[in-house]
Amino acid sequence: MASLLKVDQEVKLKVDSFRERITSEAEDLVANFFPKKLLELDSFLKEPILNIHDLTQIHSDMNLPVPDPILLTNSHDGLDGPTYKKRRLDECEEAFQGTKVFVMPNGMLKSNQQLVDIIEKVKPEIRLLIEKCNTVKMWVQLLIPRIEDGNNFGVSIQEETVAELRTVESEAASYLDQISRYYITRAKLVSKIAKYPHVEDYRRTVTEIDEKEYISLRLIISELRNQYVTLHDMILKNIEKIKRPRSSNAETLY
């Protein structure tokens, strides 16, 4: 096979070194890292911050007081009301040029700090799972032998393992999208409250979204733990077929 394709020996040595490094790292991940991480996440799920039953405890102050109602009075001193108001408003607009913005009486509108704290702990865990799955997936792909007739049952197990790892990667990436959507949706609602401070439904919707996100974050952590459990169990049960899909595997590997 080597005679069919000329390969630079120096490059070949570097590629072989890369394969050995991936193999060593992936086997350590499956044997040691996955079980340790699932226990760590299981412990995280038992922390008080993730076991709040009264969800009103995670509500945050909107920092947007309801303004006093505007009282309209009759015009006096012979001034025509609408015309006089329009002239005064025109004078103000001429004095202050630029983009119109809503003035927040109490400063910046902050996020729900309790949820932000949880999110900042969850995001690194999501990224870590994606990275580790990618390493293990590469390892299994490198173990797949060349295509040929015969008993390919072991190869099908390898392919199913790769597919499962790819699915876990995609699901983990979707968790990051979910977090981004939460921030965007909440920001739009808070902007609505700033514009329509007297509408109570907007304020209630923000608290509903915060409660929903809290439940979702706990579910994400639970799913991360379960994915480590599933991958560890699946690979260990099929490790023989994954590493040696065919009896002549040593001769048929690329």
Swiss-Prot record:
Location of N6-acetyllysine modifications: K195
Main location class: nucleus
Keywords: Acetylation, Apoptosis, Cell cycle, Cytoplasm, Host-virus interaction, Nucleus, Phosphoprotein, Proteasome
SUPFAM superfamilies for the chain: Proteasome activator
Matches recorded under Pfam families: PA28_C, PA28_N
Post-translational modification: Phosphorylated by MAP3K3. Phosphorylation at Ser-247 promotes its association with CCAR2.
Modified residues (N-acetylalanine): A2
Binding partners and assembly: Homoheptamer; the stability of the heptamer is essential for the specific activation of the trypsine-like subunit and inhibition of the chymotrypsin-like and postglutamyl-preferring (PGPH) subunits of the proteasome. Interacts with p53/TP53 and MDM2. Interacts with MAP3K3. Associates with the proteasome. Interacts with CCAR2. Interacts with PSME3IP1 (via C-terminus); the interaction is direct and promotes the association of PSME3 with the 20S proteasome. Interacts with COIL; the interaction is inhibited by PSME3IP1.
Summary of the function given for this chain in its UniProt record: Subunit of the 11S REG-gamma (also called PA28-gamma) proteasome regulator, a doughnut-shaped homoheptamer which associates with the proteasome. 11S REG-gamma activates the trypsin-like catalytic subunit of the proteasome but inhibits the chymotrypsin-like and postglutamyl-preferring (PGPH) subunits. Facilitates the MDM2-p53/TP53 interaction which promotes ubiquitination- and MDM2-dependent proteasomal degradation of p53/TP53, limiting its accumulation and resulting in inhibited apoptosis after DNA damage. May also be involved in cell cycle regulation.
Protein name: Proteasome activator complex subunit 3
Organism: Homo sapiens (Human)
